[in-house]
Amino acid sequence: MRTLFIGDLHLSADRLDITQAFTRFLDTELDDADALYILGDLFEVWVGDDIALPFALELAEKLKQVSQKLPVYFIHGNRDFMLGKQFARAAGMQILPEVKCLNLYGIETVILHGDSLCTLDKAYQRFRKLRSLSLARWLYGCLSKKTRQGIADKIRSNSKSSNQQKSYTIMDVEPNAVDALFAKTHTKHMIHGHTHRPAIHQLANGCQRIVVGDWYEQGSVLSVSAEGINLQSLPFEQAT
């Protein structure tokens, strides 16, 4: 048996090929799975459970079917932080806190989306702090659907433009932030996404940091079992 981790699928109505590949992954890759963890940014944008698009509702039905066979866990990302309990119930997903510690086959491991580790990106961290406020989230939820969609589109546009101007270092995790989280959680193994740079990092202090990749051009799946770990890419044609 094994536990699977994915993230950064960025599903949208504009890229139904990704949704199709993910659906086939759910159909073919979970027979021997103990659990599935989705580490954020399942959707490209999420402005509220009351504005779920048809493709998202269909996906919820598929995830619900999966959840009847094995637990499906979800951690919010920077794109879908407004995904709420209503959609999670429809999809059979259990929403986890921003940082979660697990015992994976005897190994204490901390999992998260990963954006909180990119501390050199000061502008984004200010936005992240604001959006985490309950009052800000409540006020946003009170806005009309059209207004929320407009704000989301503006944020996406600004983010894309800003990211093109940021350096590689700023966009990646900050080593001190990584070390601090290891110390805080008393773990030596970490799994996250967000940076879209899949890799297995063996750190000098004996810790291990694994990054799951995005699903823009191919799938990225981390499999963890008692025998070890396997970070693999999943070509879309292989998932069809």
From Swiss-Prot:
Gene3D superfamilies to which the protein is assigned, alphabetical: 3.60.21.10
CDD domains xrefs: MPP_YbbF-LpxH (cd07398)
Membrane topology recorded in Swiss-Prot or TrEMBL: Peripheral membrane protein
Necessary cofactors: Mn(2+)
Enzyme Commission number: 3.6.1.54
Cofactor descriptive note: Binds 2 Mn(2+) ions per subunit in a binuclear metal center.
Major subcellular location class: membrane
UniProt-annotated binding residues for Mn(2+) 2: D41, N78, H113, H194
Similarity annotation: Belongs to the LpxH family.
Name used for this protein in its record: UDP-2,3-diacylglucosamine hydrolase
Species of origin: Shewanella baltica (strain OS223)
Gene this chain is encoded by: lpxH
